[in-house]
Amino acid sequence: VALRHDRNRNLAHDGTMATRSTFVYSSAALRRMLGLPTSVPVQMREFWDVIWVWVKGDRPTFVSKTDFKRHFVERRQTEAQSLKVTDWLRDPPHYTVTNPATGSQHLVVEHRDRLDCDCEDYHWQQQFIGRGCCKHGYAVLQYLGFDSLQDFIQANLNGE
């Protein structure tokens, strides 16, 4: 799947530059995790395995990077549940994933060790993390009967 590059695509929603760290450890993710409105000011600093967090009006605290990563995956898995998967019945397997609410469609191509998608989220996961799975990939995994990308990879490596 060929991806076009747009130099403005790595801008976060607030106009700041997205980086390897802010892609997963973002203030937006923190607000979702804590159930805070988007208007609440937060400050974050990255350390080895935790994120120092200060929410206006509260004492500073630490949030585990593992919690951010879990939120990153679970959010995409949840969003995948409302998507519709169409199997092209080709080799290698191709799928069209449609969002019924918006009508948007994305192409997902299955490989033994990954699912490639033409969406922006997958593109940035590849660039910043080196691997990944977007909500469209998780929709295909659910369609194929897998709970996680790791289960899918293991099944393919074991020849199931």
Walk through the language-model features, giving the residues of each.
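Long, low-complexity, compositionally biased intrinsically disordered regions
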Residues: 2-160
